[in-house]
Amino acid sequence: MGPLMVLFCLLFVYTGLADSAPSCPQNVNISGGTFTLSHGWAPGSLLTYSCPQGLYPSPASRLCKSSGQWQTPGATRSLSKAVCKPVRCPAPVSFENGIYTPRLGSYPVGGNVSFECEDGFILRGSPVRQCRPNGMWDGETAVCDNGAGHCPNPGISLGAVRTGFRFGHGDKVRYRCSSNLVLTGSSERECQGNGVWSGTEPICRQPYSYDFPEDVAPALGTSFSHMLGATNPTQKTKESLGRKIQIQRSGHLNLYLLLDCSQSVSENDFLIFKESASLMVDRIFSFEINVSVAIITFASKPKVLMSVLNDNSRDMTEVISSLENANYKDHENGTGTNTYAALNSVYLMMNNQMRILGMETMAWQEIRHAIILLTDGKSNMGGSPKTAVDRIREILNINQKRNDYLDIYAIGVGKLDVDWRELNELGSKKDGERHAFILQDTKALHQVFEHMLDVSKLTDTICGVGNMSANASDQERTPWHVTIKPKSQETCRGALISDQWVLTAAHCFRDGNDHSLWRVNVGDPKSQWGKEFLIEKAVISPGFDVFAKKNQGILEFYGDDIALLKLAQKVKMSTHARPICLPCTMEANLALRRPQGSTCRDHENELLNKQSVPAHFVALNGSKLNINLKMGVEWTSCAEVVSQEKTMFPNLTDVREVVTDQFLCSGTQEDESPCKGESGGAVFLERRFRFFQVGLVSWGLYNPCLGSADKNSRKRAPRSKVPPPRDFHINLFRMQPWLRQHLGDVLNFLPL
């Protein structure tokens, strides 16, 4: 499920060595800033300017030519004086279905832009954004959406122009940047069948902009942890080290580390490249996964220090030793940056491994690949590096179904003549992820690699993983699903939300039976994977009272129909038993690949973002059935049917007395209806091959299993039935205070 990431880290920093015999003039000061030299004043040395935060150098760098003159990369004319200019953030070109203020041509550091939507549209993203000192906006792209499309409105990032205004299945939208801005992300996106746009959100940025380490580390860490979890959904948790993923024989990761050693990289910067790569190796081996690591240094030519075909590539000590022995002087005669040759070395390694294992074998096809390329700038010899990337994609058979088997992350270091277009061209394009970055210096790079895979912060993040293969059992497809019974007869369902807690409905316990006699079946009861658990504690919502409104003529009322069960023992994780993701938690945030700083409202806007949201519940026989959750105006029309139910609600005048905003509504169109006995089970959605519980089955107007003892037999209601079927599910977004009160020590909740 998760991608094995090919991290493509491009690093640019030119700090320098003072040479006693200058060949180029030394009158190169910058007003208000400083500069460094990669190799003193000698030909081939790169001069790099720096300015205080909030300013950027113009030009960014100069190269000492053999003629003894400074050349400004990319300049069409000679610049006599280097200056520090104020950083600006790009302005919106347009904002659909709303307004933004103030309207400026560009925005200064610290400046804000605010967004409001027209009536009938809901704002997604950040209502206010601030220009940061790196030339990037904080927050997320603001979008005014009415939820009418198959895919949500993809929005228009600041500084971008979009063509395409239809959001149905198969529709495409295209983006370009205004003025001299550079586009990163996908220039074209397609609305896919799962309601998600292909590719990566396009961002228009100033050529001099860069990324802060605190933004890059979580972005890389989230993607990498997702890749690790997806390599094989089976993992074990060790208390001392947090989550560790044990990949079975069928799962393997090849990690390729490519380090630039060209002349424009100083020896000190190369040492930091090595230290950063060592940090990455240390972190990745701490996950106890089956991993092979390749080490390649390059300048004009590549040098393979460790191949994934070498058995030592699976030994952390041997890999780190290879990194420590990497010698800067091995490439002292190579002045160019041949990124193509470095990537082609990876291709040749893959090709040799494919020949050994066999192209059609699972041993080859199940390997996931991650490439990390550390370089100082734009490739300048050997041809286009994208050609090598295309060959890599071809040999790995990367298509829509196998897209997760390759991730390329392009990270540049240093505000030099970094080619954003080349970085973006090489980096992978995946929904909800970024793969192209530029960091300000090697210190920032080191900081990113220190924090991107902090194992202690990944505890219990792998939730919502189901086995979707054709031969998977029903329980493997929904491993969080449990059955709850007093003594022998099954009465309700529930969902594992951690290794010891089950979420279910309060009305399952309204008879007040001794809970010590109850049992919870976890896993597949028909196989060795099923296990019966005692209940240590039952937490019933104090607000639940089915007869609370009986004196109003409402015979049954299901407000606050929610309960938690603490099992007497922890559940051992397996493909048959695994928690589902609860929205508004850090665990779900990682699964959704959302940035740090996301809120509970952000999760609700992402998961329940249309007027009709496809969802599922689990039937008595364990199969997954489909429903559509109605939102907005459609929720109102869905709930209004309750007024026709005269048996339970003979004197009902206000539907909201029965159907409060605590409930989600389904049952229209061709929806399945839950049976009696399915109450308490999860109502869940799929996003990016992960599953998220947004509700739990509570009550309804029709029982399709009435009169049948066969769990596989369900009867659809006649079209003439009055009232027509409607089903109501507790909305977990409306139960946050109660959930946080009782699960605050179990899950990591996000701000509301």
UniProtKB/Swiss-Prot annotation:
Signal sequence, renumbered to the chain: 1-20
Cofactor(s) listed in the protein's UniProt record: Mg(2+); Mn(2+)
Site entry (Cleavage), positions: R243, K244
Transmembrane annotation, as ranges: none
Record note on modification: Cleaved and activated by different proteases depending on the complement pathway to generate complement C2a and serine protease complement C2b chains. Cleaved and activated by C1S following activation by the classical complement system. Cleaved and activated by MASP2 following activation by the lectin complement system. Cleaved and activated by GZMK following activation by the GZMK complement system.
InterPro entries: Compl_C2_B (IPR011360), Peptidase_S1_PA (IPR009003), Peptidase_S1_PA_chymotrypsin (IPR043504), Peptidase_S1A (IPR001314), Sushi/SCR/CCP_sf (IPR035976), Sushi_SCR_CCP_dom (IPR000436), Trypsin_dom (IPR001254), TRYPSIN_HIS (IPR018114)
Active-site feature positions: H507, D561, S679
Binding residues annotated for Mg(2+), in chain numbering: S262, S264, T337
UniProt keyword annotations, A-Z: Complement pathway, Disulfide bond, Glycoprotein, Hydrolase, Immunity, Innate immunity, Magnesium, Manganese, Metal-binding, Protease, Repeat, Secreted, Serine protease, Signal, Sushi
E.C. no: 3.4.21.43
Glycosylation sites: N29, N112, N290, N333, N467, N471, N621, N651
Pfam families the record matches: Sushi (PF00084), Trypsin (PF00089), VWA (PF00092)
GO CC annotation terms, alphabetical: extracellular region
Keyword Magnesium: yes
Short motif (MIDAS-like motif): ranges: 260-264
Single GO MF descriptor: serine-type endopeptidase activity
Any one Gene Ontology BP term: innate immune response
Subcellular locations according to the entry: Secreted; Cell surface
Entry remark concerning the domains of this protein: The MIDAS-like motif in the VWFA domain binds divalent metal cations.
Family, per entry: Belongs to the peptidase S1 family.
Function (record text): Precursor of the catalytic component of the C3 and C5 convertase complexes, which are part of the complement pathway, a cascade of proteins that leads to phagocytosis and breakdown of pathogens and signaling that strengthens the adaptive immune system. Component C2 is part of the classical, lectin and GZMK complement systems.
Protein name as it appears in the record: Complement C2
